[in-house]
């Protein structure tokens, strides 16, 4: 095991979302569903977590390094090698929450397993 599985409470907390388009919007929706407050990088001093959702690999890496230097834990969409944490595929049947993760190795496999659990 190379990661510590945990559920992090973010209700009321600012979470940086860097990017534009659907990928960034999906991260912002995820933060909101968990009760967090998506914010721009200019408000990073209020945050502990950040999501980077940029298509350009160099821009994503630059943003991730900048946020890490500010002390934030960073997730970079589709670039697990740049991530401090990865996101599992989630089955939410409140109050039960099941998470399936491959540590970023195969999002497709994690989704497949989650769908089997939903059945």
What would you call each of these model-derived segments?
Residues 1-45, 49:
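Hydrophobic, well-ordered beta-alpha structural blocks that scaffold small-molecule cofactor pockets
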Residues 3, 7, 45-46, 74, ...:
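Glycine-rich phosphate/adenylate-binding loop
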Residues 16, 47-57, 96-104:
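Short beta-strand and adjoining strand-loop segment in the mid-core
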Residues 22, 78-82, 103-104:
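Short, ordered loop/turn segments at secondary-structure junctions
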Residues 24-26, 59-60, 106-110:
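Short glycine/serine/threonine-rich phosphate/pyrophosphate-binding segments
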Residues 49-54, 60-87:
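ADP-ribose/adenylate-binding Rossmann-like module
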Residues 92-119:
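Adenosine-phosphate binding glycine-rich loop
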């Amino acid at each position: 095991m190379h990661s510590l599985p945990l559920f992090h409470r973010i209700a009321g907390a600012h979470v940086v979302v860097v990017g534009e388009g659907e990928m960034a919007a999906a991260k912002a929706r995820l933060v909101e569903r968990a009760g967090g407050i998506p914010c721009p990088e200019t408000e990073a001093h209020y945050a502990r977590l950040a999501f980077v959702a940029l298509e350009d690999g160099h821009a994503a890496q630059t943003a991730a390094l900048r946020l890490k230097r500010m002390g934030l834990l960073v997730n970079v969409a589709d670039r697990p090698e740049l991530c401090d944490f990865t996101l599992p595929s989630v089955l939410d049947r409140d109050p039960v929450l099941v998470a399936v993760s491959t540590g970023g190795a195969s999002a497709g496999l994690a989704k497949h397993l989650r769908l089997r659990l939903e059945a």
